[in-house]
């Protein structure tokens, strides 16, 4: 499975990775979201005003074969951060293993918002835009 158009940019502070995932990965993620969207709402945990949020069990990501892709992207991000800092030798000596703490869906609609915030107990946060309405 080829991940295309991967680039790291640094518009401010930290490096930001952008990548286009294969359509098969997007399809698998959408299938997971469609299955769990009616589960217990976790929206009260969010920083903003969002009506619907559902946590995704790691087993579903593993079953759909997308967990490895998320780990590969995380590892690639870390590698590029080390290389950008001129730390190739340090990177080459490391055996980096990534771990996903949690993953959830956010169904955001008109007049809902989620302000800038941080996620505790993690070093990398990511966002996937799966179903974006036409503008």
PLM features per residue range, with description:
Residues 11, 95-97, 118-122:
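A generic structural micro-feature
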Residues 1-92, 113:
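Non-heme Fe(II)/2-oxoglutarate
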Residues 72-82, 99-106, 120-122:
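Short linear motifs at secondary-structure transitions and domain/linker junctions
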């Amino acid at each position: 499975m080829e991940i295309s158009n991967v680039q790291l940019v640094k518009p401010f502070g930290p490096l930001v990775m952008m990548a286009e995932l294969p359509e098969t990965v997007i399809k698998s993620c959408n299938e997971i979201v469609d299955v769990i969207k009616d589960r217990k709402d976790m929206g009260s945990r969010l920083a903003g005003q969002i009506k619907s949020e559902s946590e995704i069990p790691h087993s579903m990501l593993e079953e759909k074969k997308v967990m490895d892709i998320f780990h590969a992207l995380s590892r690639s991000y870390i590698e590029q951060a080390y290389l950008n800092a001129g730390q190739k030798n340090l990177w080459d000596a490391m055996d980096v293993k990534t771990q996903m703490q949690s993953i959830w869906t956010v169904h955001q609609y008109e007049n809902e918002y989620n302000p800038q915030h941080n996620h505790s107990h993690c070093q990398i946060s990511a966002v996937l835009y799966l179903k974006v309405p036409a503008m």
